[in-house]
Regions:
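Long, contiguous binding/interaction regions
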Residues: 1-118
Length: 118
């Protein structure tokens, strides 16, 4: 408890936001980059991996329209682009990958990128 306006006690509570599995994996990749002196803010070659028996053709079409290079065969799709991977820049991209996986009934297995130090 802390004193609020006019000396009245206030209870402060922080809303806890549970991290998704992908949020945790994203943070782990960024932590590995940070250990190597990479803040993630410089755009770099980044790959995203999708697996499963869902609709890879539709994923490829949507991803190409969004500016990604796509490759893969059968039950594997890899999307490529050049982007920054710091948390603020990357969060919307990560959310988009997760929504594409759900929409096309695929497993989004995460991402990797080049290390860039300046």
């Amino acid at each position: 408890m802390a004193d609020g306006p006019h000396g009245a006690p206030w209870a402060f509570a922080r809303e806890a936001k549970a991290l998704s599995e992908h949020d945790e994996k994203d943070a782990a990749v960024r932590a590995a980059l940070a250990v190597q002196g990479d803040s993630g803010v410089t755009p770099r070659h980044t790959l995203f991996y999708f697996y499963g028996e869902g609709d890879h053709d539709d994923l490829n079409e949507v991803a190409r329209r969004a500016g990604f290079v796509t490759r893969g065969q059968d039950d594997v799709t890899v999307l490529e682009t050049t982007i920054p991977v710091d948390e603020a820049s990357f969060a919307p991209v990560s959310a988009m990958m997760q929504s594409w996986a759900a929409a096309f009934q695929l497993d989004y297995d995460g991402w990797e990128c080049a290390v860039v130090t300046n």
